[in-house]
Curated annotation (Swiss-Prot):
Subcellular localization, as worded in the UniProt entry: Cytoplasm
Functional description taken from the UniProt entry: Major role in the synthesis of nucleoside triphosphates other than ATP. The ATP gamma phosphate is transferred to the NDP beta phosphate via a ping-pong mechanism, using a phosphorylated active-site intermediate.
Biological processes, Gene Ontology terms: CTP biosynthetic process; GTP biosynthetic process; UTP biosynthetic process
The protein, known as: Nucleoside diphosphate kinase
Enzyme Commission code(s) on record: 2.7.4.6
GO cellular component: cytoplasm
Positions with a binding annotation for ATP: 11, 59, 87, 93, 104, 114
Alphabetized UniProt keyword annotations: ATP-binding, Cytoplasm, Kinase, Magnesium, Metal-binding, Nucleotide metabolism, Nucleotide-binding, Phosphoprotein, Transferase
Catalytic activity: a 2'-deoxyribonucleoside 5'-diphosphate + ATP = a 2'-deoxyribonucleoside 5'-triphosphate + ADP; a ribonucleoside 5'-diphosphate + ATP = a ribonucleoside 5'-triphosphate + ADP
Active site: 117 (pros-phosphohistidine intermediate)
Complex formation: Homotetramer.
Alphabetized GO MF terms: ATP binding; metal ion binding; nucleoside diphosphate kinase activity
Species in which this protein is naturally found: Mannheimia succiniciproducens (strain KCTC 0769BP / MBEL55E)
Amino acid sequence: MSLERTFSIIKPDAVERNLIGKILARFEQSGFEIVAAKMVRLTKAQAEGFYAEHQGKPFFEDLVEYMVSAPILVSVLQKENAVKDYRTLIGATDPAKAKEGTVRKEFAESLRRNSVHGSDSLESAAREIAYFFIDSEICSR
């Protein structure tokens, strides 16, 4: 099996509560290599562009407002089955429905303030990685 890459965001609520280290440690303990990472403060235009697929949905404006409210940590994670395994690790979007032991069950505050984002497919991962990183910023180990 070959290595895959997935995209992760540690969202404003988790950054504000100083959970970056704890969440990154969970990624590494689960076998992910962090091959790129950086802190970003999104502009409204960047947030709207990243979440363009949700434009017109009832939650879109609140999502954009939330994502520009504080810095985020974007990262590229690598391992076999990265997309599927990362989605399992972070748990359901709604932390009330997330399984015990998942990142969202442990750290998320609510459906809106759910601490992390993860790509839902290899195609999404490629698009999301390219939105934030150039190739030279990704360093396989």
